Amino acid sequence: MISSDYIKDKILEIENIQGNLIRSRISEFKRLKKSDKYTLFKELSFCILTANTSAELGLKCQAYINDGFYRLDYNDLREELIKVHYRFYNKRASYIIGARDIIDDLEYIVNMDDHFRAREILIERVKGIGYKEASHFLRNVGVFDFAILDKHIIKFMKNNYYIKYENNSSRRRYLENEIVFNELAKKFNMEPGVFDLYIWYIETGKILK
């Protein structure tokens, strides 16, 4: 296990190199929380698309499709995903079309005081959304209670013996791993959704969203 001093030193190093970008990203997330329902839905669609793919591909899809996430019918959305070489074009197009039922409630959900209930609502109502994707969406709209426990974060935790298993698929395992990560974030006086950005940079060398 790497020491707390090592992580602290890495955080300071990242702050010196990428501090401005991280603060800019955090401000962007906070601004997004105040957006209209259609902008929020585009972010939700991005989070649906990043599951089992890469953030880079999700960003490419988001930039290319844009308003099409809530305007296009299934066939047209599917074709647009094919154009950007998105692998799961059938299933994810279906998920995004189905998720439109929640558009009118998104502004309410992202501003709920009970962030954990907000996450459960997303999971219950949006097919294709699990704990990781719901946490991703909420973090990206300025709810920093949640980190995104993707393969990079889980790898960091497993390799440094904070957790025993890389399997993160079940509800129980995800929430157990989340508790461990949140306790680690607390040691460094950071919100999980901010600490996540630093650990992700340690693992990937990138600051995305």
Curated annotation (Swiss-Prot):
Gene Ontology MF, one: hydrolase activity, hydrolyzing N-glycosyl compounds
SMART domains noted in UniProt: ENDO3c
Reaction equation(s) it catalyzes: 2'-deoxyribonucleotide-(2'-deoxyribose 5'-phosphate)-2'-deoxyribonucleotide-DNA = a 3'-end 2'-deoxyribonucleotide-(2,3-dehydro-2,3-deoxyribose 5'-phosphate)-DNA + a 5'-end 5'-phospho-2'-deoxyribonucleoside-DNA + H(+)
Residue(s) at site: Important for guanine/8-oxoguanine distinction: 209
Paired cysteines (S-S): none
Active-site residues from the entry: 132, 150
Source superkingdom: Archaea
DNA damage recorded as keyword: yes
Record's keyword annotation contains Phosphoprotein: no
Any GO BP: base-excision repair
Keywords associated with the record: DNA damage, DNA repair, Glycosidase, Hydrolase, Lyase, Multifunctional enzyme
EC number from the UniProt entry: 3.2.2.-, 4.2.99.18
NCBIfam families referenced in this protein's UniProt entry, alphabetically: PRK01229.1
Family note: Belongs to the type-2 OGG1 family.
Reported function: Catalyzes the excision of an oxidatively damaged form of guanine (7,8-dihydro-8-oxoguanine = 8-oxoG) from DNA. Also cleaves the DNA backbone at apurinic/apyrimidinic sites (AP sites).
Protein name: 8-oxoguanine DNA glycosylase/AP lyase
Organism expressing this protein natively: Picrophilus torridus (strain ATCC 700027 / DSM 9790 / JCM 10055 / NBRC 100828 / KAW 2/3)
